[in-house]
Design a protein with these regions (language model features):
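Bacterial N-terminal signal peptides that target proteins for export
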Residues: 1-9
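Short, surface-exposed charged micro-motifs
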Residues: 49-51, 69-70, 148-150, 178
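Flexible, processing/modification-adjacent segments and terminal tails
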Residues: 24-35, 82-149, 224, 228, ...
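An acidic-aromatic
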Residues: 52-106
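Hydrophobic lipid-interacting interfaces of membrane-associated proteins
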Residues: 34-38, 64-66, 81, 85, ...
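N-terminal leader/targeting segments and the immediate start of mature chains
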Residues: 15, 19-57, 217-219, 224-239
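Gly/Pro-enriched, hydrophobic low-complexity segments
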Residues: 126-225
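Amphipathic hydrophobic-ligand
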Residues: 42-49, 71-73, 168-173
Length: 239
């Protein structure tokens, strides 16, 4: 898969774009996005539209820039199709899908931010400066891989997510800003995420700007039903 078309690969980088979106009668959700990924002093820019089908628990990402690409996300499988090159890849992940803003949509319709479904448990909570912080511990068998998750929310809106190792080292952090009302929920229209090396050195920085949110609006081109053409050979990749 071309490097300039990869979405950031980062375990547990972020969990939600919508706080308790399941409170609204969600059937479909579409968002335009512009994404910047900075790594090693180089910035890649990607733009397109993300579609979520709640009933099918399926995400379709249409990338329009820099090159055309269609990504299909369902369960622990991600399929990527390049229509111009007529190539396709299928990635199967053991744990969470390491695609920050795609994963956040998938988890948005689940209680407890989807953490309990993969074995996380609420350890404790605290309130500081009107922000509610909840601390989530991973299942024992996955502590070395997943790390502790700390979520911050204010007025029912998710504003931050952090991942720390068992010894307290910060490995990832996401901030949610510019919330807008959609149905019964507030959607952050800007999400920034950082991956860290040891000593808090930033390894990778990602900024995503969302626009034109559409709730329960059927996309005109039936993209939600898209399947990779049967004539295309799909290369299998285990992650």
């Amino acid at each position: 898969m071309p490097k300039n078309l990869q979405f950031s690969i980062a375990l547990l980088l972020t969990f939600l774009i919508v706080h308790a979106l399941h409170a609204a009668p969600l059937k479909t959700l579409s968002l335009d996005f512009k994404r910047e990924l900075t790594e090693n002093d180089k910035t890649e820019r990607t733009a397109g539209t993300l579609h979520y089908d709640a009933e099918a628990a399926r995400v379709i990402v249409e990338v329009t820039e820099p090159l055309k690409q269609i990504m299909i996300v369902k369960g622990k499988v991600v399929e990527i199709y390049y229509p111009v090159e007529n190539q396709a890849f299928r990635f199967t992940f053991e744990g969470r899908i390491p695609l920050p803003f795609v994963e956040s949509i998938l988890q948005s319709t689940q209680a407890e931010y989807g953490l309990t479904t993969i074995g996380y448990s609420l350890d404790r909570y605290e309130i500081a400066d009107d922000v509610l912080y909840t601390y989530w511990t991973p299942p024992e068998k996955a502590k070395d891989k997943l790390g502790t998750v700390i979520l911050g929310s204010r007025d029912g809106r998710l504003i931050s997510a952090e991942v720390k190792t068992s010894d307290g080292q910060l490995t990832a952090k996401s901030l949610y800003r510019n919330h807008t009302k959609l149905g019964n929920s507030h959607i952050p229209m800007e999400v920034t995420s950082s991956l860290y090396r040891r000593k808090s050195e930033v390894l990778e920085y990602e900024r995503v700007i969302y626009s034109n949110p559409q709730l329960n609006a059927q996309p005109p081109n039936s993209i939600l039903q898209f399947e990779i053409p049967k004539s295309v050979t799909i290369k299998e990749v285990k992650w």
